[in-house]
Protein backbone atom coordinates (compact mmCIF):
# COMPACT_ATOMS: atom_id res chain seq x y z
CA UNK A 1 0.00 0.00 0.00
CA UNK A 2 1.32 3.45 -0.91
CA UNK A 3 2.39 5.69 1.97
CA UNK A 4 0.35 8.81 2.70
CA UNK A 5 2.26 11.66 4.34
CA UNK A 6 1.62 15.02 2.65
CA UNK A 7 -0.46 15.11 -0.51
CA UNK A 8 -1.33 18.08 -2.73
CA UNK A 9 -3.91 17.50 -5.41
CA UNK A 10 -6.68 18.80 -7.61
CA UNK A 11 -10.16 18.68 -6.08
CA UNK A 12 -13.27 17.32 -7.84
CA UNK A 13 -16.64 18.27 -6.25
CA UNK A 14 -19.36 15.60 -6.20
CA UNK A 15 -22.33 17.61 -5.00
CA UNK A 16 -24.64 14.75 -4.00
CA UNK A 17 -25.70 13.47 -0.58
CA UNK A 18 -26.06 9.80 0.37
CA UNK A 19 -23.86 8.43 -2.41
CA UNK A 20 -24.05 4.68 -1.88
CA UNK A 21 -21.55 1.98 -2.75
CA UNK A 22 -23.67 0.78 -5.68
CA UNK A 23 -23.26 4.22 -7.23
CA UNK A 24 -19.52 4.17 -6.51
CA UNK A 25 -19.06 0.75 -8.15
CA UNK A 26 -22.23 -0.91 -9.53
CA UNK A 27 -23.01 -4.48 -8.52
CA UNK A 28 -22.30 -6.13 -11.88
CA UNK A 29 -18.59 -5.34 -11.50
CA UNK A 30 -18.37 -7.32 -8.26
CA UNK A 31 -18.28 -10.52 -10.33
CA UNK A 32 -14.58 -10.01 -11.02
CA UNK A 33 -12.21 -12.37 -9.17
CA UNK A 34 -9.40 -9.80 -9.44
CA UNK A 35 -8.66 -6.84 -7.19
CA UNK A 36 -7.65 -4.58 -10.09
CA UNK A 37 -9.38 -2.86 -12.99
CA UNK A 38 -12.15 -1.14 -11.05
CA UNK A 39 -11.03 2.45 -11.65
CA UNK A 40 -12.50 2.62 -15.14
CA UNK A 41 -15.92 1.74 -13.72
CA UNK A 42 -15.96 4.19 -10.81
CA UNK A 43 -19.39 5.91 -10.78
CA UNK A 44 -20.10 3.92 -13.94
CA UNK A 45 -23.80 4.70 -14.22
CA UNK A 46 -23.10 8.43 -13.88
CA UNK A 47 -19.98 8.64 -16.03
CA UNK A 48 -21.37 6.78 -19.05
CA UNK A 49 -24.60 6.99 -21.03
CA UNK A 50 -24.86 3.24 -21.63
CA UNK A 51 -25.00 0.23 -19.32
CA UNK A 52 -21.56 -1.09 -18.43
CA UNK A 53 -20.53 -4.71 -18.04
CA UNK A 54 -17.33 -6.34 -16.70
CA UNK A 55 -14.55 -6.56 -19.27
CA UNK A 56 -16.11 -3.94 -21.54
CA UNK A 57 -13.79 -1.53 -23.38
CA UNK A 58 -14.68 1.76 -21.72
CA UNK A 59 -12.69 3.82 -24.23
CA UNK A 60 -15.44 3.35 -26.82
CA UNK A 61 -18.39 4.02 -24.53
CA UNK A 62 -20.41 7.28 -24.74
CA UNK A 63 -19.65 9.48 -21.75
CA UNK A 64 -21.99 11.77 -19.85
CA UNK A 65 -20.54 15.26 -20.45
CA UNK A 66 -22.44 16.71 -17.49
CA UNK A 67 -20.87 14.43 -14.89
CA UNK A 68 -18.17 16.16 -12.87
CA UNK A 69 -15.39 13.63 -13.49
CA UNK A 70 -15.88 13.95 -17.25
CA UNK A 71 -15.33 17.71 -17.21
CA UNK A 72 -11.83 18.70 -18.42
CA UNK A 73 -11.21 21.07 -15.50
CA UNK A 74 -11.31 18.13 -13.06
CA UNK A 75 -9.21 15.70 -15.08
CA UNK A 76 -6.52 14.13 -12.90
CA UNK A 77 -8.21 15.05 -9.61
CA UNK A 78 -6.78 13.25 -6.60
CA UNK A 79 -9.14 14.56 -3.91
CA UNK A 80 -12.88 13.94 -4.03
CA UNK A 81 -15.08 16.46 -2.24
CA UNK A 82 -18.42 14.94 -1.27
CA UNK A 83 -21.53 15.49 0.81
CA UNK A 84 -22.83 13.76 3.94
CA UNK A 85 -23.26 10.00 4.35
CA UNK A 86 -20.83 9.16 1.56
CA UNK A 87 -20.33 5.42 1.01
CA UNK A 88 -23.64 4.29 2.49
CA UNK A 89 -25.44 1.12 1.39
CA UNK A 90 -24.02 -2.37 1.12
CA UNK A 91 -20.56 -3.28 2.36
CA UNK A 92 -18.19 -3.78 -0.58
CA UNK A 93 -14.46 -3.24 -0.44
CA UNK A 94 -14.58 -2.75 -4.21
CA UNK A 95 -15.74 0.85 -3.56
CA UNK A 96 -12.43 2.11 -2.12
CA UNK A 97 -10.59 -0.08 -4.65
CA UNK A 98 -12.35 1.82 -7.45
CA UNK A 99 -11.62 5.22 -5.89
CA UNK A 100 -7.96 4.36 -5.38
CA UNK A 101 -7.50 2.89 -8.86
CA UNK A 102 -9.15 5.93 -10.45
CA UNK A 103 -6.54 8.09 -8.74
CA UNK A 104 -8.20 9.46 -5.60
CA UNK A 105 -5.95 9.58 -2.53
CA UNK A 106 -8.53 11.18 -0.25
CA UNK A 107 -12.25 11.86 0.12
CA UNK A 108 -13.52 14.84 2.12
CA UNK A 109 -17.10 14.87 3.41
CA UNK A 110 -19.17 15.87 6.47
CA UNK A 111 -19.83 12.19 7.26
CA UNK A 112 -19.22 8.67 5.97
CA UNK A 113 -20.88 5.30 6.36
CA UNK A 114 -18.91 3.40 9.02
CA UNK A 115 -17.95 0.29 7.03
CA UNK A 116 -16.92 2.30 3.98
CA UNK A 117 -14.91 4.65 6.21
CA UNK A 118 -12.92 1.76 7.68
CA UNK A 119 -12.46 0.07 4.30
CA UNK A 120 -10.89 3.25 2.92
CA UNK A 121 -8.08 3.15 5.49
CA UNK A 122 -7.38 -0.50 4.68
CA UNK A 123 -6.90 0.36 1.02
CA UNK A 124 -4.83 3.53 1.14
CA UNK A 125 -7.61 6.10 0.72
CA UNK A 126 -7.84 8.76 3.44
CA UNK A 127 -11.44 9.67 4.42
CA UNK A 128 -11.54 13.10 6.04
CA UNK A 129 -14.48 14.41 8.05
CA UNK A 130 -14.91 18.19 8.13
CA UNK A 131 -17.86 20.25 9.29
CA UNK A 132 -20.67 20.99 6.85
CA UNK A 133 -19.73 24.67 6.93
CA UNK A 134 -16.14 23.86 6.00
CA UNK A 135 -17.26 21.50 3.24
CA UNK A 136 -19.66 24.15 1.90
CA UNK A 137 -16.78 26.62 1.72
CA UNK A 138 -14.61 24.12 -0.15
CA UNK A 139 -17.41 23.44 -2.64
CA UNK A 140 -17.75 27.17 -3.31
CA UNK A 141 -14.00 27.56 -3.77
CA UNK A 142 -13.63 24.48 -5.97
CA UNK A 143 -16.42 25.53 -8.29
CA UNK A 144 -15.27 29.16 -8.42
CA UNK A 145 -11.61 28.56 -9.31
CA UNK A 146 -10.21 26.34 -12.03
CA UNK A 147 -7.40 24.08 -10.89
CA UNK A 148 -8.36 24.36 -7.22
CA UNK A 149 -5.96 22.30 -5.11
CA UNK A 150 -5.75 21.32 -1.47
CA UNK A 151 -2.81 20.12 0.59
CA UNK A 152 -3.46 17.31 3.05
CA UNK A 153 -0.94 16.92 5.86
CA UNK A 154 -1.70 13.61 7.54
CA UNK A 155 1.02 13.95 10.19
CA UNK A 156 -0.35 17.35 11.21
CA UNK A 157 -3.96 16.27 10.54
CA UNK A 158 -4.74 19.38 8.52
CA UNK A 159 -6.37 20.24 5.19
CA UNK A 160 -4.73 23.40 3.87
CA UNK A 161 -6.36 25.67 1.28
CA UNK A 162 -4.46 27.78 -1.29
CA UNK A 163 -4.82 30.89 0.90
CA UNK A 164 -3.26 29.10 3.87
CA UNK A 165 -6.43 28.36 5.83
CA UNK A 166 -6.00 25.09 7.73
CA UNK A 167 -8.85 22.80 8.72
CA UNK A 168 -8.03 20.21 11.38
CA UNK A 169 -9.43 16.69 11.19
CA UNK A 170 -9.46 13.67 13.49
CA UNK A 171 -8.00 10.28 12.68
CA UNK A 172 -7.44 7.29 14.94
CA UNK A 173 -3.73 6.86 15.83
CA UNK A 174 -3.67 3.27 14.53
CA UNK A 175 -5.21 4.25 11.17
CA UNK A 176 -2.84 7.19 10.91
CA UNK A 177 0.17 4.95 11.56
CA UNK A 178 -0.91 2.49 8.88
CA UNK A 179 -1.31 5.18 6.22
CA UNK A 180 1.89 7.02 7.12
CA UNK A 181 3.88 3.80 6.70
CA UNK A 182 1.83 2.24 3.90
CA UNK A 183 0.74 -0.76 5.95
CA UNK A 184 -2.27 -2.86 5.01
CA UNK A 185 -3.33 -5.92 7.03
CA UNK A 186 -0.62 -8.06 5.43
CA UNK A 187 2.02 -5.40 6.01
CA UNK A 188 1.04 -5.16 9.66
CA UNK A 189 1.38 -8.93 10.03
CA UNK A 190 4.78 -8.98 8.34
CA UNK A 191 6.05 -6.46 10.89
CA UNK A 192 5.93 -9.37 13.34
CA UNK A 193 7.50 -11.95 11.00
CA UNK A 194 10.37 -12.73 13.40
CA UNK A 195 7.97 -13.39 16.27
CA UNK A 196 5.80 -15.57 14.04
CA UNK A 197 8.80 -17.65 12.93
CA UNK A 198 9.97 -18.02 16.54
CA UNK A 199 6.51 -19.17 17.60
CA UNK A 200 6.32 -21.70 14.76
CA UNK A 201 9.73 -23.12 15.67
CA UNK A 202 8.79 -23.41 19.35
CA UNK A 203 5.46 -25.02 18.53
CA UNK A 204 7.13 -27.76 16.46
CA UNK A 205 9.46 -28.56 19.37
CA UNK A 206 6.59 -28.76 21.85
CA UNK A 207 4.06 -30.43 19.55
CA UNK A 208 6.03 -32.25 16.82
CA UNK A 209 2.99 -34.27 15.75
CA UNK A 210 1.47 -31.11 14.31
CA UNK A 211 4.27 -31.01 11.75
CA UNK A 212 3.68 -34.61 10.61
CA UNK A 213 2.49 -34.77 7.03
CA UNK A 214 -0.26 -37.18 6.09
CA UNK A 215 0.52 -39.65 3.26
Curated annotation (Swiss-Prot):
GO terms for biological process: L-leucine biosynthetic process. It comes from the Bacteria. Catalyzes the isomerization between 2-isopropylmalate and 3-isopropylmalate, via the formation of 2-isopropylmaleate. Keywords: Amino-acid biosynthesis, Branched-chain amino acid biosynthesis, Leucine biosynthesis, Lyase. Its EC number is 4.2.1.33. The gene is leuD. One of its GO terms (molecular function) is 3-isopropylmalate dehydratase activity. Heterodimer of LeuC and LeuD. GO terms for cellular component: 3-isopropylmalate dehydratase complex. Pfam families: Aconitase_C. The keyword ATP-binding does not apply. Belongs to the LeuD family. LeuD type 1 subfamily. InterPro entries: 3-IsopropMal_deHydase_ssu, Aconitase/3IPM_dehydase_swvl, AconitaseA/IPMdHydase_ssu_swvl, IPMI_Swivel, LeuD. It comes from Polynucleobacter asymbioticus (strain DSM 18221 / CIP 109841 / QLW-P1DMWA-1) (Polynucleobacter necessarius subsp. asymbioticus). Pathway: Amino-acid biosynthesis; L-leucine biosynthesis; L-leucine from 3-methyl-2-oxobutanoate: step 2/4. It catalyses: (2R,3S)-3-isopropylmalate = (2S)-2-isopropylmalate. This is 3-isopropylmalate dehydratase small subunit.
